[in-house]
Amino acid sequence: MNYNAQVLRSFLTRLGYRAADVYQEFRFAAVDQPSRPVRQVDAAAFLDGPASYRTAALGVVRTDANETVQQTVEATRSLGAPFLVVIEDDEASMWTYTASGVTQLDSTSASQWQTLLADHKKFGPGPIRLLKALQVREDVPTTGLLFDPRTLYGIQASTQLALDELLTQFLSHFDGARTTAGQLSLQTHYEVLFPLVFRLLAGKILIDREDNRISSIDPDDPRQVVATVETLYSLSPQRLQWTKARVTQLASAWLALREGLYVRNVAADDLAFVYENTLITPETRKAFGTHSTPYSAADYVIRSLRLPEGNAAAQLRVYEPFAGACVFLTAALRRFKELFPQSWTVDKVHEHLVSHFVASEIDPFACEIARLALILADYPNHNGWRITRENLFESNHLADRVSQCDVLLCNPPFEDLDEPIEGLSIHKPVVLLNTVIKTPPAFVGVVMPSGFSTHKVYREHIRHICEIYADVEVMLLPEGVFRHASIGAEVLIAQSRRGDSIIGEGSSDESTIRKSIVRRTDWSRFTQTLKTSSSDVTQVNPRTSPGLVALRPLRRIWDYLAESPV
């Protein structure tokens, strides 16, 4: 059988994959298995760098002696490749992953394994890229190849759980209940420890990915790892007195991190969720009104927007006020990488992103964490992210920033202003809505307080939004999904700005309005599939049916009575 490293690389590059994106003996963590073992495929092709389950396209592997073909396929799910060729003895078979499980697509003799992937119109980078780009308003995959891109959200959920456990274990070495005199304590030194976590995570990524930029250092020395990461990404050195007790403490924590989850195939932007999920403190939430954004909610918003592709996507300016750890911006970063011209180099994409993606945040600590999160999300590129520390409720900052963006994404604080400011509502969410109505961006995705769609405080704002945009959705999220906050929330998604020639939509007098609901019992499913529990959709004329009136529970009864003779 013609099956060796050179043949594998040559075949995958002929399909259209860049040589730099084809790997032999690629190792990855099987995050969907309890022990998260490190698995290996003989070859893997990726859409672009860095290699991760999000960019994986194809895999080729031989079965282990103690596994069946189906067991091998199931154990390889976390690679993230839509298609896997498995060779067992004299037979080769091709498999894919669906929402209901693994599915065999074809088979042939082992000597003819290349014929299973020979059609570049199906298995080249372009078709695979489209296949993995999930649109949440599509009920079923648009391909005849069966692969369901929602499968990737199952991998994402498993990955984020594994990362949470990894970092919780790391931070346990700094638990004040366990530390001794002179050691670092999470309760006392969290403003030092949290940035340290990100520096060490970046170092672990570089080490697990065998990055040449870190190959010359001693990987067992965490302080050397931190110093190297700070140099690579132009980060300010941490000022901390390293006593013998602290050095010993850090070495023990770093060992747990080093020997924990193998992160080579982890999508770097998954690490951005760590701040809001694992690192946000009750003190920070109380001081700045921070309520962490579920990553799946941010993904749902981004993938609900009908963003243009190619050069048109490159014209859009994206802004996240009240950014926290930039969960929305990192989700947008991932989506826009799918939309940019495929001819763009990695350097070109990075250069464009740092000039068109900006954020604002009042918490200085969150600003640093957000910048570190974006650095990790944009691995292996350099720094350059613009995270401005500012109080957006002062000096008309919010209005100025929103007027300059095309895509507005955020989770604002829900609290009232401490003191009244002339010209502004005392309710912070209302201030944001007033700004959107005054200078409406082309695309809007913002989190609002629970009751937004029904409370009289927001009635006029919703009416204006439905007049400005021809496509409006409100998604209701259950209580308990915002970490460190017991309240639920509603997400406003607005697009198809009327009279917008660039987007090419919104010229009709009618609007499409949606009300989607995610029930508490369905939250786990939503995080893995982005499927809501229910969605009510209708077409209305916003002048005769203002706001969300058409989606009220008794709408169909009133419509029937209006059309029926008495």
What are these regions (language model features)?
Residues 353, 388, 488-490:
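Residues that flank catalytic or metal-binding motifs in active/ligand-binding sites
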Residues 146-355, 360-367, 391, 396, ...:
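Class I S-adenosyl-L-methionine
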Residues 4, 82, 86, 91-95, ...:
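Signature of N6-adenine DNA methyltransferases within the class I
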Residues 79, 269, 313-316, 352, ...:
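Structured loop/turn residues at beta-strand edges in well-structured enzyme cores
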Residues 2-200, 253-269, 470:
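Short, basic/polar, glycine-containing "phosphate-handling" surface segments that engage DNA
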